[in-house]
Design a protein with these regions (language model features):
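Conserved N-terminal phosphate-binding loop of PLP-dependent enzymes in the Aspartate aminotransferase
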Residues: 1-106
Length: 106
């Protein structure tokens, strides 16, 4: 299972950190992008160890942008803000309110 959390991750759905968790899924691969850096260009792919264990030793792959300390600091700051400002709960509240407004248009 591959979960694409580029749009739905980092609490944007208002129910936990990841959209896939709302469906009881345990993905093998998770992709994430825009929300991890909140405007700073960064992304990540999280892979189960059993799937990636031989990748590095068999391919010789490397990335000149991987492990950038500025991007890592941005990612940590974003996580701190999500937690410190209660943004997951805020997404839940705003989402419920928006849903009510949309239902009223029926």
């Amino acid at each position: 299972v591959i979960a694409d959390e580029v749009q739905s991750g980092f609490g944007r759905l208002g129910q936990g950190m990841w959209g896939f968790a709302n469906y009881g899924l345990e993905p093998d691969i998770v992709t994430m992008g825009k929300p991890i850096g909140d405007g700073h260009p960064m992304g990540a792919v999280i892979v189960r160890p059993k799937l990636v264990s031989s990748f590095g030793s068999n391919t010789g792959y490397f990335n000149t942008f991987g492990g950038n300390p500025v991007a890592a600091a941005v990612g940590i700051a974003v996580l701190d803000v999500i937690e410190g400002e209660g943004l997951i709960e805020n997404a839940r509240t705003v989402g419920a309110y928006t849903g009510e407004l949309l239902d009223a248009l029926k």
